[in-house]
A protein has these predicted regions:
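Residue-level detector of alpha-helical hydrophobic segments embedded in or interacting with membranes
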Residues: 30, 54, 58, 147, ...
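C-terminal amphipathic alpha-helical "assembly" element
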Residues: 1-16, 82-84, 102, 116, ...
């Protein structure tokens, strides 16, 4: 972790535009289990470099959690955030979360759609999907600020990058269709 930290600080000093940090929960070779937490450690220690998650494995989380965490990171970094997302990476991570046989591509699409609806919408929230549901109605009290999700610093949202394994993959077509960057 110290070596990765120093590499990103040095890259910032050299004028690099972006630093990308992956997410793996079940490998000693890449022990960064949360790119957002790791990169938050670097915000105050860098000047201009943008931070990209390479990638947040969306099927492993409820979309509302990622909407909140990503919006917070975007604020902390004052817009130096690129949200890289994907359907996952390592089979032991899939096994850990019980999603080995799940349609992770479809889970990813539903998740990012739900995240964007949260960021674009106003409470009360009722968003239904095949894999997740988000609902805040009974406890939406606007004058107290209850039931309101944080919006990102960048408007309408941080740039989105989507992992792709090959030039003909379904994720690269999705990235092109939605004007997202492939990574």
């Amino acid at each position: 972790l110290a070596e990765d930290t120093e590499a990103i600080i040095h890259a910032d000093q050299l004028g690099f535009d972006e630093a990308w940090v992956g997410e793996h929960l079940t490998t000693a070779a890449e022990p960064i289990t949360s790119p957002l937490i790791f990169m938050a450690n670097l915000i105050a220690r860098t000047q201009q470099i943008k931070f990209g998650t390479g990638v947040i494995c969306l099927p492993q989380y409820h979309p509302a959690v990622i909407a909140g965490y990503a919006a917070m990171f975007d604020h902390l970094s004052e817009g130096r955030f690129i949200m890289g997302v994907g359907p996952g990476g390592l089979p032991p991570d899939f096994e850990l979360f019980g999603i080995m046989d799940a349609d992770r591509n479809q889970m990813m699409v539903e998740s990012i759609d739900m995240i964007l609806k949260i960021w674009e919408g106003e409470p009360p929230y009722t968003i239904k999907g095949d894999f997740w549901n988000t609902h805040v109605e009974d406890w939406h009290v606007d004058k107290l600020g209850l039931g309101r999700m944080v919006k990102p610093f960048q408007k309408p949202h941080p740039p989105i990058a989507l992992s792709a394994l090959s030039p003909n993959s379904s994720t690269i077509r999705l990235a092109a269709k939605r004007d997202w960057d492939p990574i």
